[in-house]
Design a protein with these regions (language model features):
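Single conserved hydrophobic/aromatic residue that forms the stacking wall/gate
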Residues: 1-5, 10
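Structural motif
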Residues: 11-15, 69-75, 118-124, 177-183, ...
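Asp-box/BNR beta-propeller loop motif
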Residues: 17-33, 77-88, 124-135, 140, ...
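Beta-propeller and closely related beta-sheet repeat lectin domains
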Residues: 47-50, 97-100, 148-151, 208-211
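Entry beta-strands of beta-propeller and related beta-repeat scaffolds
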Residues: 57-62, 107-110, 160-169, 218-222
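Loop/turn-rich, solvent-exposed surfaces of beta-rich toroidal or solenoidal domains
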Residues: 121, 141-194
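Conserved blade-ending motifs and adjacent loop-strand segments that build the rim/top face
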Residues: 140-149, 191-216
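Blade-level signature of beta-propeller repeat domains, shared across WD40, Kelch, NHL, RCC1
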Residues: 209-243
């Protein structure tokens, strides 16, 4: 933080580290702030959560920034050269923050966003890496939230036991308080999330953040802030989620 006049200003740095041996060793931090941050912005950071590699090899991270009007906005940044250079285009929706990105079709990205308006998740899609965004039909209606981070992953039909393309989502399944941590599955591209495809993991209060990852074709893993520990890991069979 720097004191400028009578204001405390954030001098943030967006840093990247990389591993080329499956995480055994890591590079020194690489400052990519000048590549992606508009000088007029107050703040820029990633997700939180996970990034993805698109089918064409493009690396994508969800981001959030506070612009010159002091309004937060969610979007994405991407690299087409294995992380050497990074690009950021336009915000997906204003007054949004923590987001997760998934490639729902080749070249089509879905951004699922924490929305400061409260009540439900904002969802948008892009076909040009964030130059233009389109509101998804499920936005602000299909997935309730208490204004909290959430996790979203896409799993191709060939990569899971159900033989269906899946969107898997986790968050506190409520509009009040951070409780009822739930995993949900959509088999129609995020249009609907049937009750039969939902499993509640923790009904009590917690911080509510989570991160999903496939373990194998039959199992999804979730790392989340639970009511019984700072961080909890569980493995859930897809056959318990997809009916």
């Amino acid at each position: 933080y720097d004191l400028v006049g009578s204001e405390m200003c954030i001098r943030d740095r967006l840093m990247l580290v990389k591993s080329e041996d499956d995480g055994k060793t890591w590079s020194q931090p690489i400052n990519i702030t000048p590549q992606v941050k508009d000088p007029s912005w107050y703040f820029l950071l990633q997700g939180p959560g996970r990034g993805i590699t698109m089918k064409d090899g493009t690396l994508v991270f969800p981001i959030q920034f506070i612009d010159s009007t002091r309004i937060p906005n969610a979007g994405i940044m991407y690299s087409k050269d294995r992380g050497t250079t990074w690009h950021l285009h336009n915000l997906a929706r204003t007054n949004t923050t923590e987001a997760q990105v998934a490639e729902i079709e080749p070249g089509v990205l879905m951004l699922n966003m924490r929305d400061n308006r409260g009540g439900s998740r904002a969802v948008a899609t892009t076909r040009d890496l964030g130059k233009t965004w389109y509101e998804h039909p499920s936005s602000r209606s299909a997935l309730q939230e208490p204004v909290c981070m959430a996790s979203l992953i896409h799993v191709d039909a060939k990569d899971n036991i159900t033989g269906k393309d899946l969107l898997i989502f986790s968050n506190p399944n409520t509009t009040k308080g951070r409780n009822h941590i739930t995993i949900k599955v959509s088999t129609d591209g995020g249009m609907t999330w049937p009750l039969s495809n939902q499993v509640t993991l923790d009904e009590d209060e917690s911080w509510g953040y989570s991160c999903l990852s496939m373990i194998d074709k039959e199992t999804v893993g979730i790392f989340y802030e639970s009511s019984v520990a700072h961080m909890t890991f569980q493995a859930v069979k897809l056959t318990d989620l997809v009916k």
